[in-house]
A protein has these predicted regions:
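Hydrophobic membrane-insertion alpha-helices, especially the h-region
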Residues: 17-18
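Post-signal peptide N-terminal segment of mature Sec-exported envelope proteins
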Residues: 33-52
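Exposed beta-strand-loop-beta-strand "reactive/processing" segments of non-cytosolic proteins
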Residues: 53-102, 146-177, 185-191
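Long, charged/polar, surface-exposed segments that mediate recognition or autoinhibition
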Residues: 96-150, 192
Length: 192
């Protein structure tokens, strides 16, 4: 009975979040298929992260696969449909700035949460352990080996690139200041 009640409250909370998102998140009316992608983003965000998110503060954008083309290569920039929630106001410390999901053929290909944070000291080894634990806790991958890691200039996330037991590559983003995983992305391994 207790498990049923917890599931019911979680489901009701998710529906409330979607309802708020429908009513207040975007000033422009989304198509039915775009709204479905936004609903998926909210569900996936709640599955992987517990950072507070007040949906009234965000607007939604949807970019369908193939809409954005790289001018140099004439190839699509994204592998799937990309959905983004963007905060409309100035964030405070540790508040979500943006949530981006990519869906490839209807399946979640990756999710990333950008959080406003102040610089702190960290150990790259401990952050790698956080990335591995995140993959395991969310049943994304049980066994991984580190390929490499990178900190992009002027960004607070370290990107760890892992090879899985199925020989796929997953990038995990760990915020150095929060010492928490803030995203993952399944990739062919060519880019970091």
């Amino acid at each position: 009975m207790e498990v049923y009640t917890m599931r019911r409250f979680r489901w009701m909370g998710m529906l409330l979040g979607v309802a708020i998102l429908l009513g207040a998140c975007s000033s422009k009316k989304l198509s039915e298929s775009d709204q479905l992608l936004v609903d998926y983003l909210v569900q996936d965000y709640q599955t992987y992260f517990d950072f507070p998110l007040v949906l009234n503060d965000f607007s939604a954008t949807v970019q369908k696969e193939g809409e954005l083309i790289d001018q140099e290569t004439n190839e699509p920039i994204y592998e799937g449909d990309r959905v983004t929630l963007i905060r409309g106001s100035e964030p405070k410390d540790n508040e979500v700035v943006r949530v981006t999901c990519e869906y490839k053929e209807g399946d979640l290909n990756g999710i990333f949460v950008e959080i406003h944070s102040e610089p702190t000291e960290y150990s790259e080894e401990s952050l790698e352990q956080l990335a591995v634990a995140f993959l395991s806790e969310h049943d994304i991958a049980k066994q991984v080996s580190l390929i490499d890691q990178k900190v992009k200039e002027n960004e607070r996330e370290i990107i760890f690139r892992f090879k899985t037991e199925q020989n796929t590559v997953i990038k995990v983003y760990v915020n150095q200041d929060l010492k928490q995983a803030v995203g993952f992305f399944k990739t062919d391994g060519e880019d970091l």
